[in-house]
Amino acid sequence: MAFNVRSSGSAVAGALLIASAVTGWASAASASAASLGEACCADLEDRIAELEETAARKGNRAVSLTVTGYIAKQVMFWDDGVERNAYVTDMGPTQASNFRFMGNAKIAAGWSGGYMIRIQDLSSNPMALDQFTSAAGTGPNVQMTYWYLASEELGKISVGKNAMASKSVAMFTDLSGTQVIANYVLFDGNAFFLRQGGELLKLRWGDFGYCYSQQRPWGGDCDGIVMNGVRYDSPAIAGFSMSASYGEDDDWEIAGRYQGEVGGFKVSLGAGYSVNTDELIQPPAVSFHKDSSFFQAGGYLQHLSTGLFLHAIYGAENNHGAETIRGGLIEPDAHQWYLKGGIRRQWSPLGATIVFGEYGEYIDQLSPAALNAGATGSELSRWGLGAVQEIDAATMSVWVRYRRQDVDIEGAQLDGIVAFHYLSVGSLINF
């Protein structure tokens, strides 16, 4: 049988041509798909890298990581007798909006180690506001960074930037749910200038609530600041615990605390004593040969069935005759006391409602500026009323609070100081 070679060769050539075209199209399609896949994956990998950079994560499996904190802001309406205005503020240093990174790891039975990093927002610090300054602050501030080693039987030792043993020991006895909102520290209103008649003076309200221990116009909690140091806390035994600390350079503190229930009452007690000899604890220096000691005691009593409560604080600062750098004047010994009473009841399904009144006096807490103005004694008084509504579903509190402060000054032509009034409306939400 004879084959037509020409015809057969043409058919083979045609088949090869078609196969080549199909193969080329398939290769092109495969290359295109690969290119699209690479572009897609590259975008996805970039996004994953972005998320990894911003995600909170545990550094290892042994140590836990908890992120917590709160946001607290208020609108403060103030009246100095002539001028009126409204500012949006935070709650003051050490109580400002913050977030905390806390870690813990179990080492052995009854033993653990951990750390704490606390960063606060000081961008709207009320202690820096006055008639001419509506917004002031330093922005984010690393308030605490420390590690600790804890034993259930022996207690806990902490090293780093931390609250020392007696910091706020009297103030933190307040379990009413209003401690951040209303306390005896002059967090708001202290930087405003005094007004005598219609004239503004160079002196401020905080010049009559001055603490030499920390060289700031705190009013109360005079040695209440964090610093680099070492702190020891004992285990709680039947509700009682003790603390001791050393901070640079030099600050020694001891404190005792109790919390419990006695005869149908919730009880919280605290007392502390500190000695500070660091002229540069918070620059600029104000003292020659500083030697400030501060004693504080506080308590809280709440009747469990009715919700009626009382919170009380006493503080006394002794400066042992130290002289101020400017003018060579003697730093006065001073004291303060504070009462807050009210009721805490759940009248609403939202959560507890707290209604309270407060009163405090700050005696002879004269700053270097007040001493140089000729003041020899003073009595700054402050009273207020407030209400707080807790919202349990959001771990949130909202409040309204009114305060008035007055001052009587001895030894200087400073009679007729006009009272300062302010009303605050705000909220705090935990996370």
Features from the language model and the residues they span:
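C-terminal segment of classical bacterial N-terminal signal peptides
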Residues: 19-30
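Detector for outer-membrane/organellar transmembrane beta-barrel domains
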Residues: 255-390
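Outer-membrane beta-barrel and related beta-rich outer-membrane complex signature
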Residues: 81, 127-129, 169-178, 283, ...
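Bacterial N-terminal signal peptides that target proteins for export
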Residues: 2-15
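Surface-exposed coil loops of outer-membrane beta-barrel proteins
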Residues: 83, 87, 126-138, 158-243, ...
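Solvent-exposed loop/turn segments connecting transmembrane beta-strands
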Residues: 222-227, 243-254, 331, 377-379, ...
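Transmembrane beta-strands of outer-membrane beta-barrel proteins
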Residues: 65-73, 109, 113-117, 157, ...
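Beta-barrel outer-membrane channel/assembly domains of diderm bacteria
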Residues: 3, 31-167, 225-226, 230-235, ...
